């Protein structure tokens, strides 16, 4: 007589915890909801991401809480609203005194405590600090290879974006040191040769995975790609190949990197032992026009709380564990820490988390526990609190404000010239019928249906409850700047920033 089913399930659960999955978390930069082939773009060359979508779970309603680099990355790694941690307003810069507070617990720290070999490649943008105090090696990552902030946060005239010697478009940030490439806390090059950067990241990733396998331990790879942030770059194999200009070439290289990672995982025989998650930090920077990406049918882009700013492509791939399909369940980047902790059998940090465990949804045993989503502006304050709230199919905008990042679209509500506006009653949209947020259901409240009025009450209550519950942490950005904190490959040299130049040997 066979063992009872309950016993078999318990044994299977025990084995899952005893051997947690390898995890690869891929985070694209300034990628629009409509930029991938699997999300409907007619000409994007993204076969590897499309293959992940076909073989895994594709999310249609996956969100970030803030549509800007620094706060979005903080939310991803901690499962907490950025305002709780002081990751506001705007973004950190190379000379910022502040950064992701060290008392915050990152997903890397959660997994490292479970025995994972943890590594990060790519863009950090959560602060540098004195002696690199806020960098990844102090935030749970055993290994780090990357740029500590955005690659436009330095002078672009000394950057090569396309081989053999095409300079990057625009001036970027003048008066700063050249962007540094760091290996853990050491400067590898300043500036790096961008066309060769992706190959270095892929070699780093392969070494991490292979070393973890040799050590018989799981790995966590956080690959925070610079693609498709402006100014776009790519290697020789992709330059002028996409038919979609520099943005398309950059996207093509990102997709190829995903393919390289999947090939490496397969070559190591780890496909069925590795969970791969792909998403992005915020919507497209439409002010760049053809270099800015596409939000598809969604309204606006980066820097706004409209759908084009906060709704992101998201894929989860794990053969033998995640069934192929599409889910319309609500999900957020905030949910990744509790989800990965559950799958790894790791305890949650003893802090207030704003994320939910999505493992039942991923594994096909249940639905998403998330019932609502909250969206903050790039420059939040405690007086106004949350700008927009979604529950079920309804979304309310209590405040709106345009952003320079979303300039040049045909919709003036997206532009920086669209000033902060309070809405009473709020703008209310049925996203199941109107994902573009074009038809306000409360344009005439007297004609609103009972269902719509009930949704309005629920959304107002959710906003009031969250605003009352959330305490803003001291702003890390408001700690100000110290030019001496900028990383320099020749510490103490003069004159700065010109002397901080160490040619890349890989160029």
UniProtKB/Swiss-Prot annotation:
Which effect does the record note for changing residue 138 to D? In MLD; significantly lower activity than wild-type protein
SUPFAM superfamilies the record matches: Alkaline phosphatase-like (SSF53649)
Q: What remark does the entry make about the cofactor?
A: Binds 1 Ca(2+) ion per subunit.
Question: Which consequence is recorded for altering residue 84 to W?
Answer: In MLD; juvenile form
What result follows from mutating residue 288 to H? In MLD; adult form
Location of this chain's protein in the cell: Endoplasmic reticulum; Lysosome
Enzyme class, top EC level, equals hydrolase
Gene Ontology CC:
azurophil granule lumen; endoplasmic reticulum lumen; extracellular exosome; extracellular region; lysosomal lumen; lysosome
Q: What's the effect of swapping residue 255 to H?
A: In MLD; late-infantile form; no enzyme residual activity; leads to a decreased stability of the mutant enzyme; causes an arrest of the mutant enzyme polypeptide in a prelysosomal compartment
Alphabetized, the UniProt keywords read: Calcium, Disease variant, Disulfide bond, Endoplasmic reticulum, Glycoprotein, Hydrolase, Ichthyosis, Leukodystrophy, Lipid metabolism, Lysosome, Metachromatic leukodystrophy, Metal-binding, Signal
Mutation effect (residue 293 to D)? In MLD; late-onset
Question: In UniProt terms, what is the effect of altering residue 307 to K?
Answer: In MLD; loss of enzymatic activity
Q: What is the effect of changing residue 244 to H?
A: In MLD; infantile-onset
Q: How does activity depend on pH?
A: Optimum pH is 4.5.
On modification after translation, the UniProt record reads: The conversion to 3-oxoalanine (also known as C-formylglycine, FGly), of a serine or cysteine residue in prokaryotes and of a cysteine residue in eukaryotes, is critical for catalytic activity. This post-translational modification is severely defective in multiple sulfatase deficiency (MSD).
Similarity comment text for this entry: Belongs to the sulfatase family.
Designated name of the protein? Arylsulfatase A
| Native source species | Homo sapiens
């Amino acid at each position: 007589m066979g063992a009872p089913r309950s016993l078999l399930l318990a044994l299977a659960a025990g084995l899952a915890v005893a051997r947690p999955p390898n995890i690869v978390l891929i985070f694209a930069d300034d990628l629009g909801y409509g930029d991938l082939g699997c999300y409907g773009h007619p000409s994007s060359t993204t076969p590897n991401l499309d293959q992940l979508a076909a073989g895994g779970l594709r999310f249609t309603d996956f969100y970030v809480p803030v549509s800007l680099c620094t706060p979005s990355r903080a939310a991803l790694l901690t499962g907490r609203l950025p305002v709780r941690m002081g990751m506001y307003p705007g973004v950190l810069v190379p000379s910022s005194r502040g950064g992701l507070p060290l008392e915050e617990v990152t997903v890397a720290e959660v997994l490292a405590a479970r025995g994972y070999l943890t590594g990060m490649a790519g863009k950090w943008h959560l602060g540098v600090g004195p002696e690199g105090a806020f960098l990844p090696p102090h935030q749970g990552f055993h290994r780090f290879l990357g740029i500590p902030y955005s690659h436009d946060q330095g002078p672009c005239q000394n950057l090569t974006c396309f081989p053999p010697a095409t300079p990057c478009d625009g001036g970027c940030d003048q008066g700063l040191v050249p962007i540094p490439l760091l290996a853990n806390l050491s400067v590898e090059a300043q500036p790096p040769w961008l066309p060769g950067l992706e190959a270095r990241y892929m070699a780093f990733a392969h070494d991490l995975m292979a070393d973890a396998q040799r050590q018989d331990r799981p790995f966590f790879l956080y690959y925070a790609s610079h693609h498709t942030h402006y100014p776009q770059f790519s290697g020789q194999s992709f330059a002028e190949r996409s038919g979609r200009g520099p943005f398309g070439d950059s996207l093509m290289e990102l997709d190829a990197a995903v393919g390289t990672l999947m090939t490496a995982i397969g070559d190591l025989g780890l496909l069925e032992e590795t969970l791969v998650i792909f998403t992005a930090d915020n919507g497209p920077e439409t002010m760049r026009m053809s270099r800015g990406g596409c939000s598809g049918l969604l309204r606006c882009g980066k820097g706004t709380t409209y759908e084009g700013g906060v709704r992101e492509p998201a894929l989860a791939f794990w053969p033998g564990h995640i069934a192929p399909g599409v889910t319309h369940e609500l999900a957020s980047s905030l949910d990744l820490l509790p989800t990965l902790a559950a799958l790894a059998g790791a305890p949650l940090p003893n802090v207030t988390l704003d994320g939910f465990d999505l493992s039942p949804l991923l594994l096909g045993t249940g639905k998403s526990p998330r019932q609502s989503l909250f969206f903050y502006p790039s420059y939040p304050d405690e007086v106004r609190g949350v700008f927009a709230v979604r529950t079920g199919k309804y979304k309310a905008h209590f405040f709106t404000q345009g952003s320079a990042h979303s300039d040049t679209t045909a919709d003036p509500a997206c532009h920086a010239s669209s000033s902060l506006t309070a809405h009473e009653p709020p703008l209310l949209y049925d996203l199941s019928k109107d994902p573009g947020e074009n038809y306000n259901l409360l344009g005439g409240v007297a004609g609103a249906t009972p269902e719509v009025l009930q949704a309005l009450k629920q959304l107002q209550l959710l906003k009031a409850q969250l605003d009352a519950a959330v305490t803003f942490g001291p702003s890390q950005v408001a700690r100000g700047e110290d030019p001496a904190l900028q990383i320099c490959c020749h510490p103490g040299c003069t004159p700065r920033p010109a002397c901080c130049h160490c040619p890349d040997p890989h160029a």
